[in-house]
Amino acid sequence: MTKETASFFTDRLAAADPDVLTAINHELNRQRKQIELIASENIVSRAVLEAQGSVFTNKYAEGYPGKRYYQGCAPSDEIETLAIERAKKLFGSEFVNVQPHSGAQANGAVLLAVAKPGDTIMGLSLDAGGHLTHGAKAAMSGKWFNAVQYAVHPETQLIDYDQVRDLALKNKPRVIIAGGSAYPRHIDFAFFRKVADEVGATFMVDMAHFAGLVAGGVHPSPVPHAHITTTTTHKTLRGPRGGMILTDDPALAKKINSAVFPGMQGGPLMHVIAAKAVAFGEALQPSFKEYAKAVVENAQALAARLKERGSDLVTGGTDTHLALVDLRPLGVTGRDADCALERAGITCNKNGIPFDPLPPVKTSGIRLGSPAATTRGFRKAEFLQVADMIADVLDALSSKGEQGDPAVETAVRQRVEALCDRFPLYPEL
């Protein structure tokens, strides 16, 4: 073995590429010192990190367990089968595909499996809390399909179920989609299934945001109602970034497998599937139920305190891991709010609210989520403190204008760092 070959297999990142290590350490320090409230983000275990950084990253494994196109796939079959079986047990589903690289890939594969370009699909509109992949004009789902969007009621800001049925009867969609990225309440899956059956549609639920809450038993499961359920494997499920598709229908399972590979993707990411298996194993433990319960309780505590401090909440609160704050009464935009909060050490995202008069780059709201800080160890007492910090920053924006108040932001940042120091992340990294 040459010296160059030996160093290729032995040099750590610090020696091989210090510039990349520096950037990674910057991100590690950011995560350690900031409070993460982006609802779609979470913090994985050291075990998930280890699996995702494993030698499975070297392996191509096109196909499915027992039916690969390459040799040398026995360990890949082992890890993918483990991930599948754990997911089936976790969600009570007969068939699971763990290969989608993302939630968007999973949703795209479902549409490829059950619809043709030009078919009508129905989903919750983006400004009402839906997702790009549910028929938004800018996305593939809105360009390749005749996308009909249902909305929320202007007074309650809850899904307008009467409108859902009326639109379905009028448009006879091929696919009806429930789920979203900024809808803070439970969804009546049984109603959607009844409507889908009435018009002969395939009913798909995208549970990407609340899958971990379903796994933890604190959120109604869509799996018994949906023909097909999709999800990401991160967010509340607390695994690596990736996607997954579930169904109880063997005919649909066959179509889905073909749509994922070779329809949408080539080789699966076996190192990510290994990490998915780890995360599913973690979610099967009793402690995960306690985690999921805390996620909801913390989000509700955060929302309630913000309401006490004068914020308006879309739908008045939350049943899930996220809350949507309407900033219009404060005269503050989402863009100004998320920038000011980041300066203060709290990360969230600007977000449109139902019937938002502002464009997506500005918005009238912010979205706040509890999963990451709950993973860190925050409980109700800490979330009440966080809510007060957020309210202080928002009040300063309201009174001082879009630049905010540097003194308030500095004081909040000091409180944030003190709180973060009590709940350290990855101490051995």
From Swiss-Prot:
EC number: 2.1.2.1
One cellular component term from this protein's GO annotations in UniProt: cytosol
Keyword terms of this UniProt record: Amino-acid biosynthesis, Cytoplasm, One-carbon metabolism, Pyridoxal phosphate, Transferase
Subcellular location: Cytoplasm
Residues annotated to bind (6S)-5,6,7,8-tetrahydrofolate: 126, 130-132
Record pathway: One-carbon metabolism; tetrahydrofolate interconversion; Amino-acid biosynthesis; glycine biosynthesis; glycine from L-serine: step 1/1
Cofactor: pyridoxal 5'-phosphate
Reactions accelerated catalytically: (6R)-5,10-methylene-5,6,7,8-tetrahydrofolate + glycine + H2O = (6S)-5,6,7,8-tetrahydrofolate + L-serine
SUPFAM superfamilies named among the record's database cross-references: PLP-dependent transferases (SSF53383)
Disulfide pairings: none
Record note on quaternary structure: Homodimer.
Role of this protein: Catalyzes the reversible interconversion of serine and glycine with tetrahydrofolate (THF) serving as the one-carbon carrier. This reaction serves as the major source of one-carbon groups required for the biosynthesis of purines, thymidylate, methionine, and other important biomolecules. Also exhibits THF-independent aldolase activity toward beta-hydroxyamino acids, producing glycine and aldehydes, via a retro-aldol mechanism.
UniProt-listed PANTHER family: SERINE HYDROXYMETHYLTRANSFERASE, SERINE HYDROXYMETHYLTRANSFERASE 1
HAMAP family noted in UniProt: SHMT
Family per similarity comment: Belongs to the SHMT family.
Protein name (Swiss-Prot/TrEMBL): Serine hydroxymethyltransferase
Source organism of the structure: Zymomonas mobilis subsp. mobilis (strain ATCC 31821 / ZM4 / CP4)
